[in-house]
Amino acid sequence: MYDKIDKNQYTPMMRQYLTIKENYPDTLVFFRLGDFYEMFFNDALVASKELEITLTSRDAGTNNERVPMCGVPYHAVQTYIEKLSSKGYKIAIVDQMEEASNKKIVTREVTKIITPGTNVDELYLSEKDNNYIGAIDKLTDGYAFCYIDLSTGETNVTTLPEHIDYFYNELQKLNIKEIVTNDKFPKAYRDYLKN
């Protein structure tokens, strides 16, 4: 979607955002603007709903187009990231790499990607739950299943019988935060995992 937008109709800052968003289409982009992390377009719609924060809009282009926008204060961002991550969202943190100046657009870069299963930052983890990421692959007569808590180093590898219900039961029991599969894994099962 974002790669098909004519960026020339937008302000330099919004072009910068859209360029970053092109590289992270399935990720909520937290874009640092001064003392806030802002989200735009569809990210703003999703974040405002999930975080129950106000959705506003911003003038973003030469044709006075206003785009959806919401934001959170930088000093409280951890709380919001934890909420979104616990709901299964991936987040890209885009920080300002220099002080703002009136002469040019501030350089910004993605400084961190947070996913439900790869999160190792104590700020975003719950002390009472493991933070497992799992991987599953189809074997000739069953499934290979590995799950790891990257924050503690705990690693488990096992095989599961052919019937996928065993796998579903393991997912429920372990509260896996994120699953990695490949294209050979049956589509019906991948669709189930998305839920």
Cite the ranges covered by each PLM segment.
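Basic, polar low-complexity surface loops/patches
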Residues: 1-195
